[in-house]
Swiss-Prot record:
May be a cell surface adhesion protein. This is Fasciclin-like arabinogalactan protein 17. Glycans are attached at N80, N290. It comes from Arabidopsis thaliana (Mouse-ear cress). The gene is FLA17. GO terms for cellular component: extracellular region; plant-type vacuole.
Length: 458
C-alpha cells in the first residue's frame, strides 16, 4: 500500500514538472513571435484603414498610386505614426496643374513617394503635445528623412506653412491624423519639378526608364543586375558606325546593299521598349506594334540605311482622339505617317533651325503634307492654331538612326482649300464684214457688162 502511494506521488510530481516545462516554453515562444505578428498584419482599427475610409480621398488615392501601403504597414507595425492630411480641395483645385501632372507621371514615382512621406511623422504627436508660443518651433523627422517644423502662433497650430484645421481628426491606437489646409512640398521635390520644367534634367542626360511595377504583386520590380566587367558588348559593332546626335541634322544616306549592316528591326524594338519604360507613351507604342504594321516598315527603312525622327504624342494627347478619327480604314497609319520625319533631328537641331529661320517645314512620310515648326516659349511648336503641339519630352531616344521626340498633342495636316474656278460666259464679238456689199454690187454690174461704171470694181 505504501509502495503504491509512493509510486503514485512520483508520477504526479513528474507530470507537474513536464507541465511547467511546456508552459514556460510556450510562453517564451509567444514572446518571441509577438513583435513579428504585430508588424506583419494590420487590424481594422489601424490608422491606415481609417485614412483609406476617411474624407481625405485624394490623399488616400495618391498613397495607393505611389505603392506606399506596404511601407506604411511596416512603419505602423514598428511604431505609432502621425499623418498630416491635406483637404481634398487643396489637391483638386488649389494645386498647380503642371505640378500635379508631374507627380502623376510614371517616371516621377520617387518624387511622389518623397512628397507623401513628408506628411508622415514616425511618432505620435497629438494636439495636446504641440509646442507653445514660448518654446518656438520644434523639428520632427519624417518617414522621408526630411524635417518638418511644428509651431504655435496667434492661436493657430502650424506645420511648416500649413495650418492645422482639424486637429486630432482621426485617432487610433497606432496613430492619428491631423487635417491641414494645404499640401506640404519638400525642397527636393520642388527642385526636381523646377529642373524638369526648365528642361535642365533631361537636356543633356540620357533618359532613364520609368520604374516598372509588377502587375501581380503591385510592387516595384528590382532593377537588373549590372553587367560584369569584361563581358561582350550588348550592341553589335555596326551600331558604333552610326552617326551620333552631334552630327544632326544630316541627310538620309542612300539605301544600303544586300548585306544590311544596320539591324533596323532591333533598333525599332529598342526604341519602342524605351517608350514603354519612359512612361506616358503606351498608346503610341500600341499603335506602332498592334494596330498597324508600321514598326516593321520602320525597321525595313532603317535596315536600308534611312534615318527617321518620330514625333510621339503622349497618352493624354492620344486619349483626345475621337472614334471617328480612328475608325476610318487606314486612319491610324495616316496619323502616324504625319508624325514621322524622314531625317535625323534632335531637340537641339530643331530648336536651332527654328531660331535661325523662324518657321521651318519638315517633310513627312504622309506625302505631300509637311509639318511646320516654329519657336515658341523657349521650345519648338509644331502646327498652327488648335491643332498645334509643343515639344514636351526632348530626346526620349536617340541612337543616330532613330530620334524620338515627345509632343503634347496629335498633329493633323491643314485641310486643303479647293477653289473651284467659275467659268464666266464669253461674249462673242461679231466682226463687221467689210466690202461684202461692194463685192455683190460689182458682181451684179459685171453680169450686165457694166462693172466699169464704178471705179471700185476695176
Amino acid at each position: 500500500m505504501d509502495r503504491r502511494i509512493y509510486g503514485g506521488s512520483a508520477v504526479i510530481h513528474l507530470f507537474l514538472f513536464f507541465s511547467v516545462l511546456i508552459f514556460s516554453a510556450a510562453s517564451a515562444l509567444s514572446k518571441n513571435q509577438s513583435p513579428s505578428s504585430g508588424s506583419g498584419q494590420i487590424n481594422s482599427n489601424s490608422v491606415l484603414v481609417a485614412l483609406l475610409d476617411s474624407r481625405y480621398t485624394e490623399l488616400a488615392e495618391l498613397v495607393e498610386k505611389a505603392l506606399l501601403l506596404q511601407t506604411l504597414e511596416d512603419a505602423v507595425g514598428r511604431h505609432n505614426i502621425t499623418i498630416f492630411a491635406p483637404r481634398n480641395e487643396a489637391l483638386e483645385r488649389d494645386l498647380d496643374p503642371e505640378f500635379k501632372r508631374f507627380l502623376l507621371e510614371p517616371g516621377n514615382l520617387k518624387s511622389l513617394q518623397t512628397l507623401l512621406m513628408f506628411h508622415i511623422i514616425p511618432n505620435r504627436v497629438g494636439s495636446n503635445q504641440w509646442p507653445s508660443e514660448e518654446s518656438g518651433r520644434v523639428k520632427h523627422h519624417t518617414l522621408g528623412n526630411d524635417q518638418v517644423r511644428l509651431s504655435n502662433g496667434q492661436g493657430k497650430k502650424m506645420v511648416d506653412l500649413a495650418e492645422i484645421i482639424r486637429p486630432d481628426d482621426l485617432t487610433r491606437p497606432d496613430g492619428l491624423i491631423h487635417g491641414i489646409e494645404r499640401l506640404l512640398i519638400p525642397r527636393s521635390v520642388q527642385e526636381d519639378f523646377n529642373r524638369r520644367r526648365s528642361l535642365q534634367s533631361i537636356s543633356a542626360v540620357l533618359p532613364e526608364g520609368a520604374p516598372e511595377v509588377d502587375p501581380r504583386t503591385n510592387r516595384l520590380k528590382k532593377p537588373a543586375a549590372p553587367v560584369p566587367a569584361g563581358s561582350p558588348p550588348a550592341l553589335p559593332i555596326q551600331s558604333a558606325m552610326a552617326p551620333g546626335p552631334s552630327l544632326a541634322p544630316a541627310p538620309a544616306p542612300g539605301p544600303g546593299g544586300k548585306q544590311h549592316h544596320f539591324d533596323g528591326e532591333a533598333q525599332v524594338k529598342d526604341f519602342i521598349h524605351t517608350l514603354l519604360h519612359y512612361g506616358g507613351y503606351n498608346e503610341m507604342a500600341d499603335i506602332l506594334v498592334n494596330l498597324t504594321s508600321l514598326a516593321t516598315e520602320m525597321g525595313r527603312l532603317v535596315s536600308e540605311g534611312y534615318v527617321l525622327t518620330v514625333l510621339a504624342p503622349n497618352d493624354e494627347a492620344m486619349a483626345k482622339l475621337t472614334t471617328d478619327q480612328l475608325s476610318e480604314p487606314g486612319a491610324p497609319e495616316q496619323i502616324v505617317y504625319y508624325h514621322i520625319i524622314p531625317e535625323y533631328q534632335t531637340e537641339e537641331s530643331m530648336y536651332n533651325s527654328v531660331r535661325r529661320f523662324g518657321k521651318v517645314k519638315f517633310d513627312t512620310l504622309r506625302f505631300p503634307h509637311k509639318v511646320a515648326a516654329k519657336e515658341a516659349d523657349g521650345s519648338v511648336k509644331f502646327g498652327d492654331g488648335e491643332k498645334s503641339a509643343y515639344l514636351f519630352d526632348p530626346d526620349i531616344y536617340t541612337d543616330g538612326r532613330i530620334s524620338v521626340q515627345g509632343i503634347d498633342g496629335v498633329l493633323f495636316p491643314q485641310e486643303e482649300e479647293v477653289v473651284e474656278s467659275v467659268k464666266k460666259p464669253v461674249k462673242k464679238i461679231v466682226q463687221p464684214r467689210r466690202g461684202k456689199l461692194l463685192e455683190v454690187a460689182c458682181s451684179m454690174l459685171g453680169a450686165f457688162g457694166k462693172d466699169t461704171y464704178l471705179s471700185k470694181c476695176r
